[in-house]
Amino acid sequence: MSANHMTPDEIVAELDKFIIGQNRAKRAVAVALRNRWRRQQVAEPLRHEIHPKNILMIGPTGVGKTEIARRLAKLANAPFIKIEATKFTEVGYVGRDVDTIIRDLTEYSIKQTRELEMRRVRSHAEDAAEDRILDALVPPPRGASGEPERGEDNSARQTFRKRLREGKIDDLEIEIEIAQPMPQMDVMTPPGMEEMAEQLRGMFAGLARDKKKSKKIKVREAFKLIVEEEAAKRVNEDDLRAAAITNVEQNGIVFLDEIDKIAARQETGGADVSRQGVQRDLLPLVEGTTVNTRYGMVRTDHILFIASGAFHLARPSDLIPELQGRFPIRVELDSLSAEDFVSILSETDASLIKQYTALLGTEDVKLEFTDDGIRRLAELAFSVNERTENIGARRLYTVMEKLLEELSFDASANSGEVITIDAAYVDLQLAETAGSQDLARYVL
């Protein structure tokens, strides 16, 4: 079933495979995604007036804020960009201005749409690539005009086609004409002059277009290059750009991380270099404006913005009132417990345990984690979080890496062995480090 047609229940169930707990946040993003589908069912002109309800996630680091947004975008197959709010400065200061968010999102959508189109025409491109390679191996007869005549394959050509498909001539060298790749030209222009930059790029690209070079390469490499070339010929660039821009405008998701860092705190004195300025620059983007990109104008009216922050030193009310109003849905995420850590390690798809088991399995080392080993690992990670900085589930990465450090280093020497990770093994490897506050702070 397409993600666009999934009900909120189904979306939450899909997110549950990767993220433990945080049901309120999952429900909020599931409804936001479902509302996009609902909006598409509404007739114009009312459809245009329905705007997405942006979400503000509040919670400490490592509890799943970013992962929820990333998994949602993957589920919806939507253009998605994660950016740090602290990377941007007010227009007029040295640094990136907020319009680059939409430009980067559009670049991502172009890439995503191009990959989709290339897959769609790939079978035709492969047929054309086969013919071009066979032309180099068994040239077809030429007509009176000197052009190759296409007809039924002769027996030699049929034999080579069969061997090509079976991979029996992959290492054979052939001489073939390959299109020269266009030089990567990046024209630097001031904000607002992207159209001029695009014209310059087009001019330089036009100089290099249709240039071919004869190369002597193996059939395997030639096939890949020609398939790419033939697929690119079959993709209409104008249609691709139009589809990509529509995809950004209707389905784009922007994840604004660390938004609490640009909130001006009451007790802070000094110039506050452009904190409020960045917030004011974000306002039109979130509210709905038109941004000029190298591919055309992009409207942001229906792009979904998800902001997140720990809000340890600032409060959501420290954001300027206008920006607060642009994020009507607020969700607080809970800190993770030791029980949550157990679930993260054992229940999620692509859990850390599955990842490390697969990695060491490539060297024929079999890892077996017992229930008490997993629980002890979770308890130690939770304990270190309690006594030092609480970095949430990210602590599991450092603890797991330390646990398997020696085993990973000596994996080739342990080939064919079965290693059982139980509570005793975890204590042997980690108890001393986790027990000492100083060591835990700097090692874990």
UniProtKB/Swiss-Prot annotation:
Single GO term (MF): ATP binding
Family matches, as InterPro entries: AAA+_ATPase, ATP-dep_Clp_protease_ClpX, ATPase_AAA_core, Clp_ATPase_C, HslU, P-loop_NTPase
Keywords of this entry: ATP-binding, Chaperone, Cytoplasm, Nucleotide-binding
Principal location listed in the UniProt entry: cytoplasm
Residues that bind ATP: I20, G62, V63, G64, K65, T66, E67, D257, E322, R394
Any GO BP: protein unfolding
GO CC terms in record: HslUV protease complex
Superkingdom classification of source: Bacteria
Function of the protein: ATPase subunit of a proteasome-like degradation complex; this subunit has chaperone activity. The binding of ATP and its subsequent hydrolysis by HslU are essential for unfolding of protein substrates subsequently hydrolyzed by HslV. HslU recognizes the N-terminal part of its protein substrates and unfolds these before they are guided to HslV for hydrolysis.
Protein name: ATP-dependent protease ATPase subunit HslU
